[in-house]
Amino acid sequence: MCEPRSVHWVAAKHILWYLQGTMDYVLDYRQGDGVRLAGYTDSDWAGCAFDRKSTSGCCFGLGSAVASWFSRKQQSVALSSTNAKYMAASLASCEAIWLCKMLFGLFGQPLRPSVIYCDNQSCIKLTENPVFHDRSKHIGMKYHFIRDYVQKGAVKHEYIPTDEQVADILTKALPRGKHVYFRDKMGVVRNTFLSKREC
């Protein structure tokens, strides 16, 4: 930052306040939950007011808490919400394949196909349909590898209602009640064993 302004100072203070308010939160992994990888993927559509690009969000749970998550701006402008969700599902599939390979290396046994939950049925149908048609011709070729992995059975996309879409927390600001609900579903809990003074 060669020319920091007051806006940057306000943003930095906001981050510090956030960190201070979340110091007591931890991921709660419980013994005996098993090794089942389940993912959630979501996207807003044209959420950035400057360039109209969408944000992809994805999280993968391993047992009782999330093991991997990301939120990133998409590289191109999506022409529809289905397109934005499809790009997010493609990124989630990459993450699922990588996680499965890593877990195979750790545990030495292959996992069942990863289930990735999406709240857009058109997107799910697009991942299952190997035929290119007018509705999908504008989607970049790099996102279509997802169809190959779905056909091989490496990943499976299933519908989940928007009210249960955990990845929603990674793509947009939510009302407090929804934010707390999704945070709890991700296995993020307040650590009751340590006080702030002990950290």
Which residues does each predicted region cover?
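Conserved helix-loop functional segments at active or binding sites
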Residues: 21-25, 46, 66-68, 102-105
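C-terminal reverse transcriptase regions that engage the nucleic-acid substrate
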Residues: 1-26, 161, 169-171
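RNase H-like nuclease module associated with reverse transcription
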Residues: 36, 72-199
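Structured nucleic-acid-interacting core domains from mobile-element enzymes and related host factors
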Residues: 17-41, 108-110
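Flexible loop/turn segments at secondary-structure boundaries
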Residues: 1-3, 35-37, 45-49, 68, ...
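Secondary-structure capping and boundary motifs in well-ordered enzyme cores
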Residues: 4-8, 32-33, 52, 80-85
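RNase H-like nuclease fold core
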Residues: 40-82
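Active-site-proximal structural scaffolding
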Residues: 8, 20, 53, 92-95, ...
